[in-house]
Amino acid sequence: MVLLAAAVCTKAGKAIVSRQFVEMTRTRIEGLLAAFPKLMNTGKQHTFVETESVRYVYQPMEKLYMVLITTKNSNILEDLETLRLFSRVIPEYCRALEENEISEHCFDLIFAFDEIVALGYRENVNLAQIRTFTEMDSHEEKVFRAVRETQEREAKAEMRRKAKELQQARRDAERQGKKAPGFGGFGSSAVSGGSTAAMITETIIETDKPKVAPAPARPSGPSKALKLGAKGKEVDNFVDKLKSEGETIMSSSMGKRTSEATKMHAPPINMESVHMKIEEKITLTCGRDGGLQNMELHGMIMLRISDDKYGRIRLHVENEDKKGVQLQTHPNVDKKLFTAESLIGLKNPEKSFPVNSDVGVLKWRLQTTEESFIPLTINCWPSESGNGCDVNIEYELQEDNLELNDVVITIPLPSGVGAPVIGEIDGEYRHDSRRNTLEWCLPVIDAKNKSGSLEFSIAGQPNDFFPVQVSFVSKKNYCNIQVTKVTQVDGNSPVRFSTETTFLVDKYEIL
């Protein structure tokens, strides 16, 4: 079977969306679709018509047609089966079978069509697999949007709460000022009230940085000296109040140093004309008493070529994985070549990879409940005492070849019981009194720093300290799949390339 094109058109032959799987000009495909309605015979029940050069296999969809254009020597049974799959794909992305709806989701349909057919030949996929393949790239964006919306809601709520607190503090200060002898009359009270109002305005503007102490405002007007003094006292009182609540207050210079250290930790990558991005994401759920409930890891090699002279290349893949991952190549990649020689190249060696776009050429997946596969084990042991709970938390790196950076282990705390009393700790900690969490921060966990512990005491019950959540990033991938060499198709000469490897957490919980 050789499929030339798949299209959705009107009954008059106007193309709404069309995907060509062979070299074909726009004029040619529009001419074929325009001739299609004239060939149909309404008196017959056939679902295909033929011309001297091509065959149309079609299915009516209300006021539209789903049309496959194939060669005349193709297998009509396979054509009909493929047509049914195309017809089932369209309602997945379009709520109504109308021209406007099809046009609005044209790119989604084209991506789905590409999963069904590659270079004119049907791929062995079903509807569920097509849905999975096309939605995979948008998962990260959905997570990012959800996190951003949550942060915006929390920031607005925090802004309103802070404004109410500061207004209440102003009213209390005014009441105390009227009762205190020799306060200075209405003039001083008016100046103090004005500076407090300015402080409320600035706090609302700066709510995106709730943990940074606000700097004094620039003075303006004739009473600038009084405002500076009042402002400084109000800020000091506000900072002392936050510290009493358990907040960590950073100065602006400390914030700059932290930002600079983060930038130094992640130096820019020198990208060559051929650049590979290897990314893995892990989703893991463990029980508090031990045992792995589920672990799922997804990985992908993305290829980006910035110079068209390196379009016809092959990637030499070294797979040292011993955990049993499932590998899957892109439909346009020669699967036989990859299976036999671990080479990633196009089925048609005369074609080139796309230029200036990220192309996923290899995916892999690992799903297991084998406890020995856990990269970083976390043991949380809360034990009740007379005044609450003594909590011991330990971590241990099980994969010695990994180096985990920016590790944060987040432990929930009971609300309304104050800050925890920290005993022994490896690394640093942050207490967030608003979210009632304790964050255990470790800059690096590797073979030289495989294990560590944290001890603290606080009022509460053992169930209050779960679920424990973990986040980290790593420049070494978990499954040990690497691109070791890149060569050109013609002459097998080596090509310079760069690689960027990232292993990060999608979800990592101890329930």
Curated annotation (Swiss-Prot):
Alphabetized SUPFAM superfamilies for the sequence: Second domain of Mu2 adaptin subunit (ap50) of ap2 adaptor, SNARE-like
Expression tissues: Ubiquitously expressed.
InterPro entries per UniProt: AP2_Mu_C_sf, AP_mu_sigma_su, Coatomer_dsu, Longin-like_dom_sf, MHD
Its membrane topology: Peripheral membrane protein
Modified residues (Phosphoserine): S223, S244, S493
One of the Pfam families matching this protein, by short name: Clat_adaptor_s
GO cellular component term of the entry, any: membrane
Family named by the database record: Belongs to the adaptor complexes medium subunit family. Delta-COP subfamily.
Subunit details: Oligomeric complex that consists of at least the alpha, beta, beta', gamma, delta, epsilon and zeta subunits.
Protein name: Coatomer subunit delta
